[in-house]
Amino acid sequence: MINFSLLTSIVLLASKVVGVSPSYNGLGLTPQMGWNNWNTFACNVSEDLLLSTVDRIAALGLRDIGYHYVILDDCWSDGRDSDGMLVPDSTKFPNGMKHVADYLHGKDFLFGMYSSAGEYTCAGYAGSLDHEEDDAAFFAKNEVDYLKYDNCYNRGQFGTPETSFNRYRAMSEALNKTERPIFYSLCNWGQDLTFYWGSGIANSWRISGDITAEFDRPDSRCPCDGDEYDCPYAGFHCSIMNILNKAAPMGQNAGVGGWNDLDCLEVGVGNLTDDEEKAHFSMWAIVKSAMVIGADVRNLKPSSFSIYSQASVLAINQDPAGAPAIRVWRRYVPETDQHGQGEVQLWSGPLDNGDRVVALLNGGAKERPMVAYLEDIFIDSFVGSEELSSTWNVYDLWANRIDDSTASQILVGNRTANGLLYNATQLSYADGLKANDTRLFGEKVGTIEPYGLLNVTVPAHGVGLFRLRRESRK
């Protein structure tokens, strides 16, 4: 049944944000990459944690591969002073936030901070509702480059798209007023159809409740399943597949300057298998989600480090076209896992240079052969089209992954990442793709003939991820 009241609110809201957005800031031309402390450390934050993490990210080559934002989440403040200005916790941050920003900037990182569009933050600290201009000035004064803006204790100011839009627009306008470029990342859990209005005021927006390090485990704390993209109660402890399925219809509302954020990466967090971590990283990359590390980078295992440093996958995420892949089909399979879950999916999306990304995702409990036909990969093409009548070379985007032995040597300091990992600081992903840098294209593993198919074997809870390149005609 169509909710005409809700539809009317959306139409009215859209009419207000058509054209040049007042919050457009020139940021977010590709999805943000970085690190956030929450998934591993929660409220256990400090100056030492941030600075030691920065040093580690740089030493491992992860900064140069693209992880530039270091984002301090909740629990950093000690309330407000007599003038109503935010005060950092002097025990956790004895030198203040400007000192942290200076250190990060000196190491060629960007500094992110956190607040909430509510009376309090989610952990009960001072929120920014009705303090937007003062708090934006605080962030600008401390040379913050990124704001994650949460949704807790919002005084009931939600329920329609326009209500939530107005609450989040207040901080957007306050940030712009400072004239400092600050990436604005909404964290309202997809409430009130954020994907319809987020791009008018922000650079990214969360689409669901908080992620947990589970591949496809139902949890009553994340009450909406993956078919409910407009979830009235987002909750938390949402699995990877739950969030991915919620994201499936939303790609049409994201692009250059404004991205769907599927939450931080759980690679290296919890007990996901290697195939699950690869699938998680791959799917976040192709839907053009934020790629924000949620693990303790000071204690990464080799396999997780090699996933975070896989440039051929990151090149899909950072592709200048900014076109999220779409889910072409989704089918349930009888081989369910211990949680009763089992499905397979095909995803496909265009890339800037005419290539195509293809993902065959196996959410079932057993390894299985999977097939993708060209007419499904190019779902919008017609019989006789150039796409269907061409020959395509198939490149495996995980084939050139660094091995655990090499990753271990880098992690213990016996080998440098320089010259081994891709350096997007020296050569951007856009320029590397133009230059046909082989590190960004994977390894050729086959060919699809005109009107043909891709046939691969995909492990349980795993993915086959490929770049298709049109074969040159003689």
UniProtKB/Swiss-Prot annotation:
Group of enzyme by EC: hydrolase
Known catalytic reactions: Hydrolysis of terminal, non-reducing alpha-D-galactose residues in alpha-D-galactosides, including galactose oligosaccharides, galactomannans and galactolipids
CDD domains the UniProt entry points to: GH27
Database matches in Pfam families: Melibiase_2 (PF16499), Melibiase_C (PF17801)
Residue positions binding substrate: 73-74, 148, 206, 252
Keyword Glycoprotein among UniProt keywords: yes
Glycan attachment points: 44, 176, 271, 414, 423, 436, 455
InterPro entries in alphabetical order: Aldolase_TIM (IPR013785), Glyco_hydro_27 (IPR002241), Glyco_hydro_27/36_CS (IPR000111), Glyco_hydro_b (IPR013780), Glyco_hydro_melibiase (IPR006215), Glycoside_hydrolase_SF (IPR017853), Melibiase_C (IPR041233)
Active site positions, chain numbering: 150, 210
Disulfide bonds: 43-75, 122-152, 222-238, 224-231
Similarity-based family: Belongs to the glycosyl hydrolase 27 family.
Subunit relationships: Homotetramer.
Protein name: Alpha-galactosidase
Species per Swiss-Prot/TrEMBL record: Torulaspora delbrueckii (Yeast)
Species lineage: Eukaryota, Fungi, Dikarya, Ascomycota, Saccharomycotina
UniProt gene name: MEL
